[in-house]
Every structure is written in structure tokens, then in C-alpha cells.
Amino acid sequence: MDQSSRYANLNLKESDLIAGGRHVLCAYIMKPKDGFGNFLQTAAHFSAESSTGTNVEVSTTDDFTRGVDALVYEIDEANNVMKIAYPIELFDRNVIDGRAMIASFLTLTIGNNQGMGDVEYAKMHDFYVPPAYLRLFDGPSTTIRDLWRVLGRPVVDGGFIVGTIIKPKLGLRPQPFADACYDFWLGGDFIKNDEPQGNQVFAPFKETVRAVNEAMRRAQDKTGEPKLFSFNITADDHYEMVARGEYILETFADNADHVAFLVDGYVAGPAAVTTARRAFPKQYLHYHRAGHGAVTSPQSKRGYTAFVLSKMARLQGASGIHTGTMGFGKMEGEAADRAMAYMITEDSADGPFFHQEWLGMNPTTPIISGGMNALRMPGFFDNLGHSNLIMTAGGGAFGHIDGGAAGAKSLRQAEQCWKAGADPVEFAKDHREFARAFESFPHDADALYPNWRNSLKLAAA
């Protein structure tokens, strides 16, 4: 059935829709399936399924219903681009406080439309949120400024937070795990649980929390510097998440503000993120996105992009989210990911299709991880343009030839090298831990700095 007469209006102007402030706008890359309708007909069916319609006209439809139809307002068939305007009245709101929810946003904009028989694929690449709807989201309650404050740094441009993930990701018992934390903290700032770490039979949660608390206190006494840890509180059950968080805060006591809470936001979903945001508003909310590649990968033509995921995370209240390495690490990514980092940190930013004003909503910190080490960092910072972020380098720290503490120091020295505008090989001559990173990661060293062996007088590793 051709629904384009009802669910499409190509006379609408995007500027007018934005000025009106009553629509969420979404941009998709969509391809109709052969043998069905043309591009506009398929787009209109997609819009109907995403709002008030179905595959037939129903007798219960009235004038009010038609007034909240989602409408296709722009198409670019040559590039498979489709833009849809969703009236904000369509989106579900909390009964308890009238707030907006990402679950409803996803259900409409990327729900049943993903399984439509006449759509070969459709993927959301950007969305715009009008002020009236944006103000209904929680947004972050804490930011990187809170971590800088704990670390004793300026709360503006407080700089690079040197972090790691304890490796191996599974298999360490509580005391060896805590010992690895202590080792890294002798040179670094921040440690996170890897995403599967929790309450395994070989590493009971409470025992691990107590051991990490003791290791943090020893490291702080040894270095005279504050330290940070991000604990995974992800669970299927709201009460389990709260119980884990409360036990951590009780154990760390006067160091409670040194603790962040990590949530596997993609696999556990928006409800888990909101549980952490609302139950623990004083804690830094660390959004881990494990599993997101199933829909965000450039190889996947359905779902939504990593850019969309990060923008949703800011709305939900994530203090920080993993944003990849912009192609400088081991995970999928590209230099264009810089736009994602700016979208979640700035108050006014451009996405691939829409400009977004955040109206003073707190920023979300880019957390960089996935195959990074000291040698890759100068190029990464060049691409991003600043170093106000958290980096969690697992192998990049514990793969250092001299151990975790030296690995942490090499990461810090890499940022110092970049800020000084120095040549990395020349800088390494006066910075031992950074120099030893060349020996620790010779494959990267050969690729990035081909003459390093002669310049540093080092043998092949």
C-alpha cells in the first residue's frame, strides 16, 4: 500500500521544523528491497511503522492521530538518504516525573522498522533533539571536572587522565588483581574493571572490592597522589546494581569520590544506565559500550552508528563513554570519529547531518581504549586536537617491557611529548619509560617511526 500521501511531505523545510521545536529529526541511510515500492513509498511505509501507522488503514484513526504522524520530509535517493520528523508527543514519558526515556526513542526510531519486509536495510546516522524534548532527559550529573578535582588538578583543562584495564580480563583472583592495580597506580591515575569482571566464582565481588580499596590506599600513601577506580556494577537486576554500588561506597568510605561506576550500557540497556545515573548521582557514570559493534559497525547496514550511540549516552546521563581510538588502536574506527568526541563534549556541535545545541547539559567525556600504547598517542592527540580525556590502555600499560608502572609513565610521557610539540624519537632520548615503549611495541615503532632503532641505539626486540 502506498502511504506516501499521508506519511511524507517533501514540502516541509528542515529549518522550519527546527524553528518550530516540536519534532525530533532522524537521518537514515535506507535502501528499499527489490520488488516492492519505490524509494519514497518505502520511506513512507518506514515512517508509518515508526509512528501511527501499519500496513493497512485502520478504522480507529482520527484527526488527532493524523496530527502526530511521523513524516518523511527529505529524501536523496542517489545517496540513499531519508530524513524523518517525529512529533515529540509520540515519545513515552515517565509516570513518576514526566522525564524522557531513551527506550522510547529507540522503540520508535529504530524499532519495528528494522524488520520490515520491503526494506533491505536502514541505519540511523544522526538525530536532532529540539529544546523542549532535550530538557526532559537527565543528562550527566558528574563530569571529568569531578575527577580532575579529586586528582587535585584545575577543573578547566585538567588534562590527560592516564588509565588502564587490568589484564588478563578474566582469570585473576582478588589479590593478584589488586596487586596489578597497585603496580599501575605507582605511575598512573585511573583503573577500570574490564567489562566482564564482576562476581566470578574465582574472584568474589566483595573480596575484590576490599582488596582494591586496600591497594588504592597503599598506592596513595606511596605516591602522595590520589587514585581512581571504575567498578563494574552491571547486572540484569536493578536491586543487584544498587547493592553492588552501595557496598563499594561503604567499603571505600572517605575515598568514595575516588570511585566511578561502570555500566555495560549497550548489553544491559538504557534501564541499567538510568539505574546507575539516578541511584548514584554523585558518582562518575562510566558507560562501556561492549557489544555495540553488532549494530554500529560500518559493516552493519542496520541499526545505528557509534555517533548515534554516543549522543544517546549523553542524553541518558553518561559521564563518560568509550569512543574508540579514531583508527589509531585495534578496534574499528576512523579519524572522522573526532566529530563524535566533539558532539558529546561541546555545548554546540555539528554531526554528519544535524547541528545540535545542548543548552548547558553537562558534557560526556571521551574514554579512549582498544590497542593504544604510548607510541600511537601523539598521532591520536594530533587528530583530536586536545588531551582532556581518559585513556584506558590495557596492553599498552602491562605490555610495557618494564611492567605496569613504567607503562603508565610512558603513557603520561607520550602526552607530554605531544604537548611540547617534540619529535617522539628525540623526546624518548631523555624519557626512559617512553624510550622503552619503542622496545616494548617494536611493530608499532617500525611502522610509525622507521628510524627509531638507529636514533635510540636500541636492538630489535
Curated annotation (Swiss-Prot):
It comes from the Bacteria. The modification N6-carboxylysine is found at K192. Mg(2+) binds at K192, D194, E195. Its EC number is 4.1.1.39. One of its GO terms (molecular function) is ribulose-bisphosphate carboxylase activity. Binds 1 Mg(2+) ion per subunit. CDD domains: RuBisCO_large_II. Its cofactor is Mg(2+). Pfam families: RuBisCO_large, RuBisCO_large_N. RuBisCO catalyzes two reactions: the carboxylation of D-ribulose 1,5-bisphosphate, the primary event in carbon dioxide fixation, as well as the oxidative fragmentation of the pentose substrate. Both reactions occur simultaneously and in competition at the same active site. This is Ribulose bisphosphate carboxylase. It comes from Rhodopseudomonas palustris (strain HaA2). The lineage of its organism: Bacteria, Pseudomonadati, Pseudomonadota, Alphaproteobacteria, Hyphomicrobiales.
